[in-house]
């Protein structure tokens, strides 16, 4: 269908939007916006625009949704119409560099002259009066011209460096041109320098071997200042190391300073130890003697006597305060738990405790009363209560003995008194078994009484 120069193929949704089957969401949206602007009913007065606009909207809604688009693609594949209406999809992702070969205008770094040929003086045939263009838009063209000139200079200088040994003599008699004036001047200078050095080397045949080596090196490396940088080999390149060597340190002087410091520290430590021993000696002397009864009072000088006397008096007061201190007070306050011997600790399992355990083990657990032959309910209830009270008292006695047992303290010395501790533990286990037996009997009596009471 065609309306107002708009042709639409209504066979598929892809053909309605004019998009291939592999189109992206952006392409679908762009084509939808174009068609919507042209076919909108408000902008066109034809009758068929509303129907076409509905078709475009339906196509966009289905193709913009991934699930609906996948279902629609399956339907087209089954019908065999999936790739029939692609309308020449444009291949935008093309390799731009395909089929193009770029030539390298510049030489390698080792063959490039110093300054890249920009600062080389101009020849006589080149124009000296160059007027720069004032228009800023033409700066790129001027830069390109300078680049082309520099590349031509690189080519000429590289050719001269390859022919530095002068194999062809005919190259020296070439007519001057605009492109090779500078190259001829540089090559003539280089050849003249190399010839002079070779002549000096041939004339000095009877020299020492060291001088011969120096002359040979000069002959090999006979170059001009312009070609000196790129003719240098890798082995002869000047390279600064990443970590520069430090200046020579005076190690002996540093060690002597350290020794002096260590000796001072040792002297200070030795002085402190002597002072500490002197204080102890003075305290011992003041405990037995006093300052008034000492015979050495007249032998000590007056200045030293005042210092020693003040120290002795202060130390004597401190010693008088601490001399009456006794360790028995600590033992009396803390008790005998931490200051006891192992034998005293083993005697914690007293004989009375063992007797109580044995008495409880000898007592038999009373059998539960037979309440079935008693006809009256009150008699059954009284008999059951008496049994429970008696067993409760027995349980209290057993629990009291177990709670006050001293096996926990005796276990601290288990390595020496193993037999006594194990015997005591076995008796406690028997008491626990008896306690469980009493509990079972009480439970049976209570259950039977509850059944009979409830009927």
UniProtKB/Swiss-Prot annotation:
This is J protein JJJ2. GO terms for cellular component: endoplasmic reticulum membrane; nucleus. It comes from the Eukaryota. Residues 104-241 are annotated as: Disordered. Its main location: cytoplasm. The lineage of its organism: Eukaryota, Fungi, Dikarya, Ascomycota, Saccharomycotina. Keywords: Chaperone, Cytoplasm, Nucleus. Residues 12-76 form the J domain. GO terms for molecular function: Hsp70 protein binding. Residues 156-168 have a biased composition (Basic and acidic residues). SUPFAM superfamilies: Chaperone J-domain. Residues 133-144 have a biased composition (Low complexity). It comes from Candida glabrata (strain ATCC 2001 / BCRC 20586 / JCM 3761 / NBRC 0622 / NRRL Y-65 / CBS 138). It is found in: Cytoplasm; Nucleus. GO terms for biological process: cellular response to misfolded protein; chaperone cofactor-dependent protein refolding. The keyword Glycoprotein does not apply.
């Amino acid at each position: 269908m065609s309306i107002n120069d708009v042709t639409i193929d209504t066979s598929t949704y892809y053909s309605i939007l004019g998009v291939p089957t592999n189109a992206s969401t952006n392409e679908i949206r762009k084509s939808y916006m174009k068609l919507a602007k042209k076919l909108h009913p408000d902008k066109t007065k034809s009758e068929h625009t509303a129907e076409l606009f509905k078709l475009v909207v339906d196509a966009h809604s289905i193709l913009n949704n991934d699930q609906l688009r996948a279902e629609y693609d399956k339907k087209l594949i089954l019908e065999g119409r999936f790739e029939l209406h692609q309308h020449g999809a444009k291949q935008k992702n093309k390799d731009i560099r395909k089929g193009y070969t770029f030539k390298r205008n510049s030489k390698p770094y080792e063959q490039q002259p110093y300054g890249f040929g920009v600062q080389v003086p101009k020849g006589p045939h080149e124009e000296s009066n160059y007027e720069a263009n004032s228009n800023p838009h033409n700066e790129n063209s001027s830069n390109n011209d300078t680049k082309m000139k520099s590349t031509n200079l690189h080519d000429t200088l590289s050719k001269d460096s390859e022919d530095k040994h002068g194999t062809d003599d005919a190259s020296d008699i070439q007519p001057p041109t605009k492109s090779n004036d500078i190259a001829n001047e540089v090559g003539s200078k280089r050849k003249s320098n190399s010839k002079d050095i070779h002549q000096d080397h041939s004339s000095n045949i009877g020299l020492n071997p060291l001088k011969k080596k120096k002359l040979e090196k000069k002959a090999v490396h006979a170059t001009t200042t312009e070609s000196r940088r790129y003719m240098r080999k890798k082995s002869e390149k000047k390279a600064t190391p990443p970590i520069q060597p430090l200046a020579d340190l005076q190690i002996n002087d540093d060690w002597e300073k350290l020794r002096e410091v260590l000796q001072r520290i040792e002297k200070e430590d030795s002085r402190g130890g002597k002072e500490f021993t002197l204080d102890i000696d003075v305290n011992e002397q003041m405990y037995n003697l006093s300052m008034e009864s000492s015979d050495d009072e007249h032998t000590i000088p007056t200045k030293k006597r005042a210092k020693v006397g003040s120290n002795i008096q202060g130390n004597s007061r401190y010693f008088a305060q601490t001399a009456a201190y006794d360790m028995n007070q600590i033992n009396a306050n803390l008790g005998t738990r931490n200051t006891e011997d192992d034998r005293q600790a083993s005697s914690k399992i007293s004989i009375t405790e063992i007797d109580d355990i044995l008495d409880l083990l000898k007592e038999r657990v009373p059998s539960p009363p037979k309440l079935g032959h008693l006809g009256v309910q009150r008699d059954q209830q009284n008999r059951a209560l008496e049994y429970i009270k008696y067993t409760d008292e027995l349980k209290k006695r057993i629990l009291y003995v177990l709670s006050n047992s001293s096996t926990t303290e005796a276990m601290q010395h288990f390595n020496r008194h193993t037999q006594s501790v194990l015997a005591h533990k076995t008796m406690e286990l028997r008491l626990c078994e008896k306690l469980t037996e009493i509990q079972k009997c009480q439970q049976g009596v209570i259950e039977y009484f509850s059944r009979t009471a409830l009927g």
